[in-house]
């Protein structure tokens, strides 16, 4: 009852040139109830502005893992859709603890440059292995001795970020990103952002924001007018 509650809003749900309707269902267990304190607003995290490409939104998911799921030409059209970032339990995939595979196809929305790039995946509950175009580029254990991972207890609290090997990202065609998630209990999934691609310079700024805290920085107001 005393926690700040923040929910990601898919951009596709916001009507920028029309009225929007917000409904909040509150369940009170005992004592006083209701929306008890603010701020109440639609906002954004500064770290999402650091992304060269935002990969949050609709992904595909299958609740197991096979190495062939990472193949570039693998057909995932029969997989379920899921919103990232959010736990899979919050989206109706209840009572599942174990391995799941996330897949995302994307074409870069930015131009190729000489600067190193990083794939940032926010927080994942609990462990992960990440493949880009069929190549393993990172896993949970890679984060343990980094500024993002060496101050917090529990894999689910570690912010993931993996350097993209030079020459692996395709700029004129689709890329296939696969994240294998192993949930050891309770909630699972890619549950907190940002999720996307950063330049090395922006990644340095991102690391500084979280060097001493795994909590998101202050939400900045966003005007819709």
Summary of predicted features, one role per range:
Residues 2, 99, 121-123, 155:
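Short solvent-exposed loop/turn micro-motifs enriched in small/polar/acidic residues
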Residues 3, 11, 15-93, 142-143, ...:
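An acidic-aromatic loop/edge-strand motif
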Residues 5-7, 96-109, 157-163:
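Short beta-strands within extracellular/lumenal beta-sheet-rich domains
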Residues 8, 109, 135-145, 163:
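Short regulatory "switch" loops immediately downstream of catalytic or recognition motifs
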Residues 10-15, 103-115, 122, 164-170:
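Extracellular and analogous surface-interaction loops
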Residues 20-26, 79, 106-137, 177-181:
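Aromatic-lined ligand-binding clefts that engage carbohydrates, nucleic acids, or primary amines
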Residues 53, 100, 104, 117:
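A broad, low-specificity signal marking well-ordered, structured residues that form hydrophobic/aromatic
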Residues 93-97, 113-115:
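Surface beta-strand/loop "capping" patches
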């Amino acid at each position: 009852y005393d926690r700040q509650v923040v929910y990601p809003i898919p951009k596709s749900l916001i009507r920028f040139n029309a009225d929007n309707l917000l409904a909040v269902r509150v369940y009170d267990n005992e004592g006083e109830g209701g929306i008890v304190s603010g701020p109440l607003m639609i906002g954004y995290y500064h770290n999402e502005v650091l992304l060269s490409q935002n990969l949050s939104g609709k992904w595909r998911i299958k609740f197991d893992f096979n190495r062939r799921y990472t193949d570039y030409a693998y057909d995932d059209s029969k997989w379920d859709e899921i919103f990232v970032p959010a736990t899979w339990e919050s989206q109706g995939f209840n009572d599942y603890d174990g391995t799941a595979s996330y897949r995302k196809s994307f074409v870069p929305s930015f131009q190729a440059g000489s600067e190193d790039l990083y794939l940032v995946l926010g927080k994942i509950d609990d462990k992960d292995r990440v493949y880009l175009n069929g190549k393993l580029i990172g896993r949970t254990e890679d984060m343990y001795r980094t500024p993002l991972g060496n101050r917090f207890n529990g894999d689910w609290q570690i912010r993931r970020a993996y350097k993209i090997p030079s020459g692996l990202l395709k700029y004129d065609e689709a890329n296939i990103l696969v994240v294998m998630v192993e949930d050891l209990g309770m909630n699972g999934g890619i549950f907190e952002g940002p999720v996307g691609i950063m330049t090395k310079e922006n990644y340095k700024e991102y690391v500084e924001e979280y060097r001493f805290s795994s909590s998101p920085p202050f939400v900045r107001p966003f005007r819709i007018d």
